[in-house]
């Protein structure tokens, strides 16, 4: 989901275009519906995204539905958070983060 976050279809159909053309960091949560840690992290990611409405774009990519994106970005474990800035991957963190660690990560790039 891209919610400033965009709609699911748009993020998946236009992922590369959105990442490359964004003038602000893009924070992507690669996840799957069956993943317990992903379910625990989802509300943290969603709530934290509301704190940065114009400073970062937040996206969720379901690696089950979008296997091509998961493969392209070499997602080996989930959840994996990938930060893109100026169209390039600048940081990657695997595993669920607590709210403070997530905010610290975001603040590194805004």
What kind of region is each of these model predictions?
Residues 1-7:
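N-terminal targeting signals for export/organelle localization
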Residues 8-25:
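A short beta-strand-turn-helix
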Residues 23-25, 42-61:
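Conserved helix-turn-beta segment immediately C-terminal to the redox Cys motif
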Residues 61-71:
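Structural microenvironment flanking redox-active thiols in thiol-disulfide oxidoreductases
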Residues 77, 82-110:
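Non-catalytic, surface beta->alpha helical segment in thiol-disulfide oxidoreductase systems
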């Amino acid at each position: 989901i891209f919610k400033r976050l965009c709609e699911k279809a748009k993020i998946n159909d236009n992922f590369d275009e959105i990442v490359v053309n964004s003038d602000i960091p893009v924070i992507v949560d690669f996840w799957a519906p069956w993943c317990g840690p992903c379910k625990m992290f989802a509300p943290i990611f969603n709530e934290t995204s509301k704190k940065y409405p114009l400073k970062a774009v937040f996206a969720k990519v379901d690696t089950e539905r979008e296997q091509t994106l998961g493969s392209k970005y070499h997602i080996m474990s989930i959840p994996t958070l990938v930060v893109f800035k100026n169209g390039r991957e600048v940081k990657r963190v695997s595993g669920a983060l607590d709210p403070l660690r997530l905010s610290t990560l975001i603040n590194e790039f805004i």
